[in-house]
Amino acid sequence: VMNGKDKISVIIPCYNVQKYIMRCFDSIYSQTYGFENLEVILIDDLSTDNTWSVLESLQRQYPENVISLKTQK
């Protein structure tokens, strides 16, 4: 519990979403609930574009709130 609110986990499966994932993330980030009360779990399903690089970058930028995972073949 943070600031009297329950923490919410947002799970986003990803496959070749390099073009769209930032728009999705920005939408989550701007929610009135407060980003500090969110845990965003991004799961890359072996994308063939640069999705994984974007997810890693988000995790580095927001280490307290973002977890990036990559499925294994």
For each feature predicted by the language model, list its residue ranges.
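A conserved acidic beta->alpha catalytic loop
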Residues: 44-53, 73
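Short loop/edge segments at beta-strand edges and connector loops
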Residues: 70
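Acidic helix N-cap motif at the loop->helix transition within catalytic regions
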Residues: 22, 49-58
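Generic preference for flexible, low-structure residues
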Residues: 24-26, 37, 44, 56
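N-proximal low-complexity "stem/linker" segments adjacent to membrane-targeting elements
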Residues: 1-30
